[in-house]
Structures are given as structure tokens and as C-alpha cells.
From Swiss-Prot:
It comes from Arabidopsis thaliana (Mouse-ear cress). Gene3D superfamilies: Glycogen Phosphorylase B. This is UDP-glycosyltransferase 91A1. PANTHER family: GLYCOSYLTRANSFERASE, UDP-GLYCOSYLTRANSFERASE 91A1. The gene is UGT91A1. Its EC number is 2.4.1.-. CDD domains: GT1_Gtf-like.
Length: 470
């Protein structure tokens, strides 16, 4: 391996190791931050698995290929129950993700060997590698937890001294007692049931609950870096710093930029032609990402709600999470024929940033993952939201408090929703006078998320901290 310090002539250039969790919602922001570090002349080593790196490489500009060193480490082979080529959360069923974490823990030895040989200045790591901070400390390497979660999620997590607090799903249905300001940020019961199993309690032999993973990383790191900014959630960032008694530094939201290598393919030209034919801000853009998959019942209500709303739509439909998914979902019979005059269902890949940035898009019907929220705000698109997994419920409550997006009403116990609630929510946010506040507020927040000079200053402050505290 290259020892980048050998090439550091004046001692001001850093070698930073990036070690994200095996989910694209984590690997992509880690790569985006890696690009920004490299653009300032620092060296970056990006550790992940071979297949994940191969899927990330198309996102890398050619001018950065010499300063970002991709370190391919294979997951250990064994009886880990993962499918062939299962190297990211999108590659495996939800019930097998614990085995992906066990395999990730199996990278401990090769990661240690790389750190010993390369002698970096910093390791920026994700929540899952609870075993890494003691190793970095032994080697004299500074460790930062770079959180792909926002400050509100970190502020809701259990800090030191509250080990016996919140031990059942129902305990998560109200803001925790350490939050000193008024907020509605908490889980609904149906959300608690999903996250509690893997986060607080673990039933898979050999796996470690997420609360212990993230707790070990936060306790062991020197500093917490957050993909966020003070203009969005100063109170949550301040609370996180107070709770954990160590620096909490926002790096900015890392706003996405359209792919510079993107070419006008026949696919995009077909999509663009359809969007160009529609009025400004008239289209509901529907997409639920690579992780979330609505159930058949949920998909039916979404489709029938779109139909009932009477609004034009462009739906990027994913019917299964991967080739291993043997239960694809299907649209209600006759739906596409009945809505053909005002809607398009797209079953292939689409360049999301270009689609989102199109003037015809007036609303996004989506999940409230943090990366998705950033993209929508970046292009001033208000959101109608459905929670499916992970921290999405917390993200959605923050967005609702700021009246940038609207949660489609659901039964709080079972999580079911109706076509009427979908239709009413879409019309509220997109066209009704009562929903004007959402449309105006997202424009205002775009002035923060889309202000590249402001976001660059966050990155500069982050890098200054790394250099000063190497």
C-alpha cells in the first residue's frame, strides 16, 4: 500500500481513510466528502468491498483518480448466509442484513493491516465499525465519526448515562427526556416495531445491536462530523455536542450535483421529452429509492391515491428490491390504462438529479431518507412522505416541523394508509392554498442547501479542523 506521508512535502497535506457502512446511502456521501477532501490536495483512501467500489467508480471524476486510493477488501467467506455478490444492503433481503454486519465485522483484520502499513492522519468511519476506534487509538491515528444521519437522529439516540431508559418500542413514541426544547421528533408505534428489533435488541447470533455499534463509535471517536448545517438544525447539533461532550462539526449537506459524465442517452431523452410536454410544477415525481419497497397493499393505495388525486405524475417504479426478491409487487389492474393521459410509469433506471431538477416537477412523493430530503430541497421540491425503514420517521418529523414536507396520515399502530389520505396529501402540498406554506418554505431552505459558497465554507472549516488536530 502507498504511504501517502512520504509525499507530504510541507506537512500540511493529510492522508484520510474513509470507511463507510455497506449501504449506498452511506457510501455515496462518504465518496462525495472524499472528492471534496481530494480537491483540496489531500490524499484519500476509500475502503470498501470490490463490487461496491466498482459501482462507485463511475461517480469519480478522472482528475481525482490519482488522489483517491480505492482499497478493495473482500468480505470473509463463510457460512454467512449472504447471497452471491451480496456486498451492500440493496443486495440482500432485510432479514439478512444482520449477516452483512457480521461480515463487515470480519474486515477488522485487513482494515487494521492497512492502517498499520499506510499510517494515515485520520480515519473517518461509519456507525457500524464499533471495533475500530480502539485500533486507531493504539496506532496513534485520530478517528472521526462521519455521520450520514442528521443531527436530529443523533440527538434522539441514547447518550451515556441512560442505559436503563427506553427499553421497549413504546418508549420511543415520545421525545426523550434529555431533549430540552419542544419538538415532535419521535417514532410512531409502527415505526418503532421495525427499528427496535435490530437497533435495540438483536436476535441474530453473532451480531451486535446497532445501538451498541453507534454507541461504541461515538464513545471512542475524537470528533463527530455530521452531514448537516446549522441553518437547518442548530439546536440538534448543539444538543448532540452537549450530550457526548466532544466536538460536533457539520460538514455541510454535501448537495448533489448532476453527473458531469452523464450523456443524453435515448432513455433520458425519452423521459425529458415527456417532462418537457408538461406545465411548470405540475408533475408529482414518485420514487421510493433502492432500499424501500412498499407492500402490495401499500402499492395499491399509492397508485389508487395518485389516480384519485387527478394530478399528473411520473413514477419510477421498482417492483422488487433485487434478483433474490421472489415477491414482486404489481400495479392495480387497469391503472396504467386509466391514467395514461396524465401519468407515466417508468420501470427502468432514471437519472434522478436531472429528473428532480426539471421545471415540470412540482412535488416529490417519496420516503424521507436524509439523502432524498437533501436532493428534494436542493431543487426546491416540497415532499409528501411515506416512512418505510430506519431513521426515516425522525427525518420526516423534522421536515414536518419546518413545513417543508407533509407526512401522509397513517394508522399509528399498524401503519396502514388509504388512497384518500394519499390523494388529499398530494393535493394539499401541491395545489391547495393551505399547502402554500410548504411550497414557500422549501424555496427558502433551497437558499441554504443550494448555496454552494455557503456549503463550501462548511467543508473548509471541516478540513481546517482535520489539519489543526491531525
Amino acid at each position: 500500500m502507498t504511504n501517502f506521508k512520504d509525499n507530504d512535502g510541507d506537512g500540511t497535506k493529510l492522508h484520510v481513510v474513509m470507511f463507510p457502512w455497506l449501504a449506498f446511502g452511506h457510501m455515496v456521501p462518504y465518496l462525495e466528502l472524499s472528492k471534496l477532501i481530494a480537491q483540496k490536495g489531500h490524499k484519500v483512501s476509500f475502503i470498501s468491498t470490490p463490487r461496491n467500489i466498482d459501482r462507485l467508480l463511475p461517480r469519480l471524476p478522472e482528475n481525482l483518480s490519482s488522489v483517491i486510493n480505492f482499497v478493495k477488501l473482500s468480505l470473509p467467506v463463510g457460512d454467512n448466509k449472504l447471497p452471491e455478490d451480496g456486498e451492500a444492503t440493496t443486495d440482500v433481503p432485510f432479514e439478512l442484513i444482520p449477516y452483512l454486519k457480521i461480515a463487515y465485522d470480519g474486515l477488522k483484520v485487513p482494515v487494521t493491516e492497512f492502517l498499520e502499513s499506510s499510517k494515515p492522519d485520520w480515519v473517518l468511519q461509519d456507525f457500524a465499525g464499533f471495533w475500530l476506534p480502539p485500533i486507531s487509538r493504539r496506532l496513534g491515528i485520530k478517528t472521526g465519526f462521519f455521520s450520514a444521519f442528521n443531527g436530529a437522529t443523533l440527538g434522539i439516540l441514547k447518550p451515556p448515562g441512560f442505559e436503563e431508559y427506553r427499553t421497549s418500542p413504546a418508549d420511543f413514541m415520545k421525545p426523550p427526556k434529555w431533549v430540552p426544547f419542544e419538538t415532535s421528533v419521535a417514532f410512531k408505534l409502527f415505526e418503532c416495531r421495525f427499528i427496535f428489533k435490530g437497533f435495540m435488541a438483536e436476535t441474530t447470533e453473532g451480531n451486535v445491536p446497532d445501538i451498541h455499534r453507534v454507541g461504541g463509535v461515538i464513545d471512542g471517536c475524537d470528533v463527530i462530523f455530521v452531514r448537516s448545517c446549522y441553518e437547518y438544525e442548530a439546536e440538534w447539533l448543539g444538543l448532540t455536542q452537549e450530550l457526548h461532550r466532544k466536538p460536533v462539526i457539520p460538514v455541510g449537506v454535501l448537495p448533489p450535483k448532476p453527473d458531469e459524465k452523464f450523456e443524453d442517452t435515448d432513455t433520458w431523452l425519452s423521459v425529458k421529452k415527456w417532462l418537457d410536454s408538461r406545465k411548470s410544477k405540475s408533475i408529482v415525481y414518485v420514487a421510493f429509492g433502492s432500499e424501500a419497497k412498499p407492500s402490495q397493499t401499500e402499492l395499491n393505495e399509492i397508485a389508487l391515491g395518485l389516480e384519485l388525486s387527478g394530478l399528473p405524475f411520473f413514477w419510477v417504479l421498482k417492483t422488487r428490491r433485487g434478483p433474490w426478491d421472489t415477491e414482486p409487487v404489481e400495479l392495480p389492474e387497469g391503472f396504467e390504462e386509466r391514467t395514461a393521459d396524465r401519468g407515466m410509469v417508468w420501470r427502468g433506471w432514471v437519472e434522478q438529479l436531472r429528473t428532480l431538477s426539471h421545471d415540470s416537477i412540482g412535488l416529490v412523493l417519496t420516503h424521507p431518507g436524509w439523502g432524498t430530503i437533501i436532493e428534494a430541497i436542493r431543487f426546491a421540491k416540497p415532499m409528501a412522505m411515506l416512512v418505510f425503514v430506519y431513521d426515516q420517521g425522525l427525518n420526516a418529523r423534522v421536515i414536518e416541523e419546518k413545513k417543508i414536507g407533509y407526512m401522509i396520515p397513517r394508522d399509528e399502530t399498524e401503519g396502514f394508509f388509504t388512497k384518500e389520505s394519499v390523494a388529499n396529501s398530494l393535493r394539499l402540498v401541491m395545489v391547495e392554498e393551505e399547502g402554500k406554506v410548504y411550497r414557500e418554505n422549501v424555496k427558502e431552505m433551497k437558499g441554504v442547501f443550494g448555496d454552494m459558497d455557503r456549503q463550501d465554507r462548511y467543508v473548509d472549516s471541516f478540513l481546517e479542523y482535520l489539519v489543526t488536530n491531525r
